Regions:
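Conserved active-site tyrosine of GNAT-family acetyltransferases
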Residues: 18-22, 85, 114
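Core segments of cupin and vicinal oxygen chelate
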Residues: 2, 9-53, 100-103
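Active-site beta-strand termini and strand-to-loop segments that position acidic
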Residues: 45-50, 109-112, 122
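Vicinal oxygen chelate
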Residues: 5-13, 61-86, 105-110
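Residue-level recognition of short loop/turn positions
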Residues: 89, 112-113
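N-terminal beta-strand motif that seeds the catalytic metal site of vicinal oxygen chelate
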Residues: 1-20, 68-71, 121-145
């Protein structure tokens, strides 16, 4: 599939309480991450070990009443996909913005059913790393045979 879901975000009224809940229920590792853009208090959520199926995400203070759980879809160009969103009846909630230097960009939209979804565009640095990671995985798989 060309555009997989690659990240989730869980908003919480009480981040410490939510952190304890998800760690105790699922055994997820949750730790605070520095976020230079906007000073947002953000926690990385690791749900799997490297090489295992699944996605990781984030936990943060709810910044608006009713803020829902959000999934982020990986795309090559946020601007292109926001154009597709609006052309097909969706609306842009948050235009493209950089997460932090070297971390890529995100945007948020609502679909025709008022569901909120996010878009994630890797940074140029991350795009350069991707082929190297694929080559490394292929080499490991070849050694196992």
């Amino acid at each position: 599939m060309p555009n997989p879901i690659v990240h989730f975000e869980i908003p919480a009224d009480d981040v410490t309480r939510a952190q304890t809940f998800y760690q105790n229920v699922f055994g997820w590792k949750i730790k605070q991450m520095p976020m230079p853009a906007g000073g947002l208090e953000y926690y990385g959520v690791t749900t799997r070990k490297d090489g295992e199926a699944g996605i990781n995400g984030g936990l943060m203070k709810r910044n608006m009443p009713g803020q829902p759980f959000a999934n982020y879809v990986a795309v090559k160009s946020i601007d292109d996909f926001l154009g597709k969103v609006t052309a097909n009846g969706g609306s842009v909630i948050m235009p493209r913005q950089e997460i932090a230097p070297g971390m890529g960009s995100i945007a948020v939209f609502k679909d025709t059913e008022e569901n909120m979804m996010g878009l994630y565009q890797p940074s140029k640095q991350e795009m350069k790393k991707a082929p190297a990671k694929k080559a490394k995985k292929a080499k490991k798989a070849k050694k196992r045979r």
